[in-house]
Amino acid sequence: MSSPSSLPTADVLVLGPHPDDSEIANAGTLLLLQRAGQRVVLLDVTRGEKGSRGTAAERAAEAAAAAQQLGVLARGNLGLPDTGVRVDDHATDLLVGAMRAVRPTLLLGPHAQDVHPDHTAVAQLAERAWFLAGLRNYQPQLGAPHRPRVFLRYPGNRPIEPTLVVDITAVADQKAAVVRCFRSQLNPPDRAHLVLGLDVAERALVRDQFYGARIGVRAGEPFWHDGPLPVRDVAPLLG
């Protein structure tokens, strides 16, 4: 597990509130990006230590296994308190430093529409850090300014109306294997604490089927972008 400031440069930076959030939402897209030669770095914001299942050490081991299975370049952690993420200068500067170290073209972060307060806070934190990271005179000691050109948001515990849906049918089985690395979050004997009554693997499967059906495929991952995305070549839209 790398510290945020020592993360390597990459094409894609994925911000997850807790270990497993990035994989549940994005593993298929990340597998496809890497097939296309894109370098991916994962950055968890907390260690998930306040969750109902799994210790911080167990979840760290699961996150490392998932990262290896996914084949990403590196995985880091901001070390902010689980259930206590705040959008303050300290957290902002940690994330600004990470963005300037990784220097991604694409940033993936959680959508603010969520029942978990950490997800909402991380969404707001990402928005703030994304902007400030590009300012030349903001905390220059954190590195040269850099603002990811594309910033996509992914859903957590609530559905979103997506701007785009990525067809992940070709890698759906690989994604399922990655998500199953989070063994402490699978098949709990008591489901009363689960927001939607589903464990992480079940939630990923059902959501991918739902959004996949919306574009006529077996599995899809949804993303939201603030404003229209430019399309310079219409031909790929024809299939």
Locations of the language-model features?
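Metal-dependent de-N-acetylase/amidase catalytic core
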Residues: 1-15, 87-239
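Active-site rim/loop-helix segments in enzyme catalytic domains that contact anionic ligands
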Residues: 1-102, 224, 234-239
